[in-house]
């Protein structure tokens, strides 16, 4: 079986080869918050260490519920760096669907961020679940991203050694019934990105506008490191 670079391989390569180049840019309150590859890498690696310090690790499921934002990408990467499995959710799901996914996936924590109607959606999150809030969109009764990473040293190197390990569970939107989860390993995601990039040449410094929800498998793969 052919080997393809995983998204973590690609992220680490960009982090090392172009640390000072812009990776993510997000409009917040009338201005832009920018993150270079190095800056994002530090946040990702420190949050991974924070997740490990909370007792989360290999194959533990961690959910993300937020509209598109820079910290969505960083949270998803941090989950992988911590050895956990990402469970992204559509940011317009009903509380019942949110609860169903969290229970079905056996999620042990959730990143809760930029949302319309956050109070209503929070009703779908079990009270005993660990909730981490994104900067710029911090909700009440959540653990603060910045506070969590402040006390951590970044994890080192590339933690993904097994490309066949489970990377993420992508659930359907639930519009035609209960959401259904599809399991993707690192190899499958790397294969898809590689084949896509074979058809689009000379992409190096173009600006990519993220429009589709990041919980959509194509958007998630290509925005992160495609």
Q: What do these predicted ranges mean?
A:
Residues 2-23, 42:
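A short N-terminal helical cap/helix-turn-helix that marks the beginning
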Residues 41-46, 182-203, 208-211, 221:
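Conserved structural elements of the adenylate-forming
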Residues 61, 67-87, 91-95, 103-109, ...:
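A short helix-loop-beta submotif of the ANL/AMP-binding
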């Amino acid at each position: 079986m052919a080997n393809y670079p995983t998204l973590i391989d690609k992220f680490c390569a960009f982090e090392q080869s172009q640390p000072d180049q812009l990776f993510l840019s997000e409009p917040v309150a009338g201005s832009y918050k920018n993150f270079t590859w190095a800056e994002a890498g530090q946040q990702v690696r420190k949050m991974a260490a924070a997740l490990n310090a909370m007792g989360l690790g290999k194959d533990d499921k961690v959910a993300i519920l937020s509209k598109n934002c820079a910290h969505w990408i960083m949270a998803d990467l941090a989950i992988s760096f911590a050895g956990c499995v990402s469970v992204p959710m559509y940011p317009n799901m009903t509380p019942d669907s949110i609860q169903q996914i969290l229970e079905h996936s056996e999620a042990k924590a959730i990143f809760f961020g930029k949302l319309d109607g956050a109070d209503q959606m929070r009703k779908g999150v079990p009270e005993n679940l660990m909730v981490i809030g994104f900067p710029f969109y911090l909700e009440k009764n959540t653990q603060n991203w910045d506070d969590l990473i402040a006390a951590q040293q970044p994890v080192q190197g590339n933690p993904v050694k097994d490309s066949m390990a489970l990377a993420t569970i992508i659930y359907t939107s639930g519009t035609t019934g209960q959401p259904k989860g599809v399991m993707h390993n690192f190899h499958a995601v790397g294969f898809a990105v590689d084949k896509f990039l074979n058809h689009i040449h000379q992409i190096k410094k173009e600006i990519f506008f993220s429009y589709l929800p990041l919980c959509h498998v194509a958007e998630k793969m290509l925005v992160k490191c495609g």
